[in-house]
Amino acid sequence: MADRVRKPEWLKINIGANDRYTETKRIVDSHCLHTICSSGRCPNMGECWGKGTATFMIGGDICTRSCKFCNTQTGRPHPLDANEPTHVAESIALMKLDHAVVTSVDRDDLPDLGAGHWAHTIREIKRLNPQTTIEVLIPDFQGRMELVDLVIEANPDIISHNMETVRRISPLVRSAANYDTSLQVIGHIARSGTKSKSGIMVGLGETPQEVETIMDDLLAVGCQILTIGQYLQPTHRHYPVAEYVTPQQFATYKTIGLEKGFSIVESAPLVRSSYHAEKHIR
C-alpha cells in the first residue's frame, strides 16, 4: 500500500528546538492550552514554534467528530473552560505575536456548537492585544449561518474553513461534514466582507482535474486564499496515503490557482492551513 512506501526526501524535516521553541512550549504548557501543532502532529511545529508562533486550539482537545485524516482525539468533550479565552489572549501577549491563529475542535455536543466561545475568545484576544491581527479556522457549525455570524461579528481579520479534499473523496474521510455545506459556509463568510480562506490536502487519491474543480468551486463562492498540502497518515488506523505528490505538481497547482483568481495560494508538500499565515493578512 502507498502509505507503507518510504516517504520521499522532500518530506523529511528536522524539528530542532531553539530557545524560542522552548519558550513557546513553556507558555503554551503553563497556560494549560492546546495547539493543533502538537495534537495534529504538524510537520511545521519546529519551524513555527522556533519563530515564536503557534496555532491555538480552543474548545478542549477532544473532538465530537472522527475524520479519517485527523489525529485529534475523538470522544465526549469536557465542559468548556470559561478561562480559556483569557488564557489564549494572555499567551498571545507573552509571545508578542503580530498575527495570531486560532482553531477549534468540533463541539457538536453544545447548543451553539461552540460559536459563543469562539466569539468570546476573539474579543478577548482583541482586548489584550489590540495591535494583533487574528485569523480563525472554524468548523462548519453544521451549516447554521446564525452561528457563523457570531464569529463574523467578533471581527477577526481572516476567517478560514477547510474543504479538506475534493468532492468525491470528502464523504470517505470527513465525519459529519458535507462538501456543499462547507462551500456555503465559505460563501457566507466572503459575502460578509471578511477575508475568506480554505485549505485542502492532496495525496488522498484525487486527480489534478478534481483539484482544479474544487478551486473553481471555491472561487465561485468568493474564497480569496487557498492552501494546498500533502496528506500524511497520522497512524495506521487513519486513511492511507494514496500518493506523495511531487513538489513540481504543487508548484503547478499554485500557478493554476493564481491564474484562476485566488489572491494567495500556498502550495507545497509541508503546507498546512496556518503555514505562513502572517503573510496572508497583507
From Swiss-Prot:
Q: What class of enzyme is it?
A: transferase
Which residues are recorded as binding [4Fe-4S] cluster 2? Answer: 63, 67, 70
Annotated cofactor note: Binds 2 [4Fe-4S] clusters per subunit. One cluster is coordinated with 3 cysteines and an exchangeable S-adenosyl-L-methionine.
**Catalyses which reaction?**
[[Fe-S] cluster scaffold protein carrying a second [4Fe-4S](2+) cluster] + N(6)-octanoyl-L-lysyl-[protein] + 2 oxidized [2Fe-2S]-[ferredoxin] + 2 S-adenosyl-L-methionine + 4 H(+) = [[Fe-S] cluster scaffold protein] + N(6)-[(R)-dihydrolipoyl]-L-lysyl-[protein] + 4 Fe(3+) + 2 hydrogen sulfide + 2 5'-deoxyadenosine + 2 L-methionine + 2 reduced [2Fe-2S]-[ferredoxin]
Specify the protein name: Lipoyl synthase
Q: Which GO terms describe its molecular function?
A: 4 iron, 4 sulfur cluster binding; lipoate synthase activity; metal ion binding
Which key words tag this protein in UniProt?
Answer: 4Fe-4S, Cytoplasm, Iron, Iron-sulfur, Metal-binding, S-adenosyl-L-methionine, Transferase
Pathway given in the UniProt record: Protein modification; protein lipoylation via endogenous pathway; protein N(6)-(lipoyl)lysine from octanoyl-[acyl-carrier-protein]: step 2/2
Taxonomy, top ranks, is: Bacteria, Pseudomonadati, Bacteroidota, Bacteroidia, Bacteroidales
The organism is Bacteroides thetaiotaomicron (strain ATCC 29148 / DSM 2079 / JCM 5827 / CCUG 10774 / NCTC 10582 / VPI-5482 / E50)
> What is this enzyme's EC?
2.8.1.8
- Please give the SUPFAM superfamilies that the UniProt record associates with this protein: Radical SAM enzymes (SSF102114)
Task: Quote the gene name from the UniProt entry.
Answer: lipA
Obligatory cofactor(s): [4Fe-4S] cluster
- Could you name the domain of life of the organism this protein comes from? Bacteria
Do you know which NCBIfam families this protein is assigned to?
lipA (TIGR00510), PRK05481.1 (NF004019), PRK12928.1 (NF009544)
Give any Gene Ontology cellular component: cytoplasm
Q: Name one Pfam family in it.
A: Radical_SAM
Cross-referenced InterPro entries: Aldolase_TIM, Elp3/MiaA/NifB-like_rSAM, Lipoyl_synth, rSAM
Give residues annotated as binding [4Fe-4S] cluster 1.
37, 42, 48, 274
Q: Which family does it belong to?
A: Belongs to the radical SAM superfamily. Lipoyl synthase family.
Residue ranges of domain Radical SAM core in the record: 49-263
Cellular localization per UniProt: Cytoplasm
